[in-house]
Amino acid sequence: MKPRFDIIRASRWFFLLSGAITVAGVIVFALFGFNLSTDFKSGSEVQFELNQRVPEARVRQMFASIGLPLGDTSLTVGGIQQNVVMVTLPEQLTAKQISEIQAAEHRFFPDAKQDIQVNSVDPFVAEQTARKAVYAVLAAAACIVVYIAIRFEFRFAISGIIALLHDAFIVLAAFALLRREVDLTFVAALLTIVGYSINDTIVIFDRIRENLKIDKPETVDELRAVVNKSLWQVMNRSIRTVLTVLIAAVILYFFGGISIRNFTFALIIGLVSGAYSSIFIASPIWVAWRSRSMKKATRGDKAAPIPE
């Protein structure tokens, strides 16, 4: 039965959509940049838990009273009861400042559940962490290229990497636009997204390869038909998989605590983007590339002299 919607024939619209998102992302980066956590820049994180829903205005007043005014993105509230406070400060706190914060906490919130927890990172450690995070992502991408090139072919590998870059860019743009904090859990989420997306893409590529062996397309139209059929054959599997993982990620986002909120938020965006790119970006790119090779081969055959 012929599929109701020809994904490959409509691929130019998906490319335009992704292109528009990419342009919007570049604009967001240029205007806002990233809200880096102390993992990637020097500074301090202060965390404590109250026995009530966090009154943000009073927390800001508490820090202002000791000469540490908070910016718009410096205060994060989490916890199931919204009673956990995490404050990011650009400077490394001294022992005196930490004592002043503890005294201010007892003064403003005498019934607080726990004492102040402070985590400080110096510039050298932050720089090293940022560099290692970039290396981790690049190493993962390189290993993926090699694996797909060996198992399938080089065109499949490049198409898959383009889809992965698309997913990573979508997540990065969302964090820049929403001013979400980029920390080490974000890097972990990015690597998780890469793993999920490439797994989904490999399943699709494997189905395409099997159908190519069976149908043996000789023209571009036949190639497009085979790939389109393959995409619809794995569509239900892809949708069920992403929905299953999404449900778990959403539950973690709301009930998993403040420490993994950035991880789960990035995961939610990346899962949706990964499911989209595996079907609507990676495979159409491969088809466009393979079609060009087939057309060149056809023109070469026509131009070849007829043997006497």
Curated annotation (Swiss-Prot):
PANTHER family: PROTEIN TRANSLOCASE SUBUNIT SECF (PTHR30081:SF8), PROTEIN-EXPORT MEMBRANE PROTEIN SEC (PTHR30081)
HAMAP family per UniProt: SecF_B
Compartment(s) of residence: Cell membrane
NCBIfam families to which the protein is assigned, alphabetical: 2A0604s01, transloc_SecF
Membrane topology annotation: Multi-pass membrane protein
Coarse class of the protein's main subcellular location: membrane
InterPro entries: SecD/SecF_arch_bac (IPR022813), SecD/SecF_bac (IPR022645), SecD_SecF_C (IPR048634), SecD_SecF_C_bact (IPR055344), SecF_bac (IPR005665)
Highest taxon above the source species: Bacteria
Encoding gene, per UniProt annotation: secF
Source organism phylogeny: Bacteria, Bacillati, Bacillota, Bacilli, Bacillales
GO biological process terms on file: intracellular protein transmembrane transport; protein targeting; protein transport by the Sec complex
Keywords annotated in UniProt: Cell membrane, Membrane, Protein transport, Translocation, Transmembrane, Transmembrane helix, Transport
Function: Part of the Sec protein translocase complex. Interacts with the SecYEG preprotein conducting channel. SecDF uses the proton motive force (PMF) to complete protein translocation after the ATP-dependent function of SecA.
Keyword Transport: yes
GO molecular function, one term: protein-transporting ATPase activity
GO cellular component: plasma membrane
Coiled-coil ranges (or none): none
Protein name (database record): Protein translocase subunit SecF
